[in-house]
C-alpha cells in the first residue's frame, strides 16, 4: 500500500466512482466491500526458502504445505517464526482425507508463519509488497466504501 502503483489504482477507482455517481439521474447509493483486508509485508519479514528437491512446498505463503522428511523441513524453516504442524495435527483442522484424491494432496506438514511474515518458495517469482489474506486481525477488518449521488 502507498506505492506509486497503489496511488495509480486509487485514482482510477475514484474516477470510476465519480462516473457511476454521475451516470444515474436517480438517487443511488453504492456500497463496495471486499472479503477481507490487506497488509503490507516489510522486507525484513520476507523469508526466502532454501531447500533441496527432496522437499515439496506448496499451498499458501503463510500456511505452507510441505511433503518430505521432518529433519529437512525443520532445517528449512528453522529461522522462520511460526509453528510446524504434523499430519496428525492437521487432521483436526482439515479433517482426514476420505478418498484417493484428497490423500494425494494431503501434506505431511503445514508450517503456519507468524503474523506479518511471509515465505517465498523457490518456485515463486512474484515480489509481493502486500498480502491479501485473512490470518491476522488486521486482515479480518473488511473494507467498506459507501457513496451516493444525493
Predicted regions and their residues:
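Feature captures the catalytic ectodomains and active-site-proximal regions of enzymes
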Residues: 1-150
Amino acid at each position: 500500500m502507498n506505492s506509486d502503483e497503489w496511488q495509480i489504482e486509487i485514482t482510477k477507482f475514484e474516477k470510476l466512482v465519480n462516473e457511476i455517481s454521475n451516470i444515474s439521474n436517480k438517487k443511488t447509493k453504492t456500497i463496495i466491500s471486499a472479503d477481507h483486508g490487506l497488509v503490507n509485508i516489510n522486507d525484513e519479514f520476507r523469508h526466502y526458502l532454501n531447500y533441496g528437491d527432496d522437499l515439496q512446498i506448496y499451498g499458501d505463503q503463510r500456511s505452507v504445505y510441505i511433503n518430505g522428511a521432518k529433519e529437512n523441513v525443520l532445517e528449512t524453516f528453522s529461522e522462520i517464526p511460526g509453528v510446524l504442524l504434523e499430519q496428525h495435527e492437521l487432521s483436526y483442522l482439515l479433517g482426514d482425507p476420505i478418498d484417493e484424491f484428497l490423500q494425494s494432496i494431503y501434506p505431511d506438514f503445514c508450517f503456519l508463519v507468524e503474523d506479518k511474515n511471509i515465505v517465498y518458495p523457490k518456485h515463486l517469482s512474484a515480489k509481493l509488497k502486500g498480502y491479501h489474506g485473512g490470518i491476522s486481525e488486521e486482515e479480518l477488518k473488511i473494507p467498506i466504501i459507501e457513496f451516493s449521488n444525493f
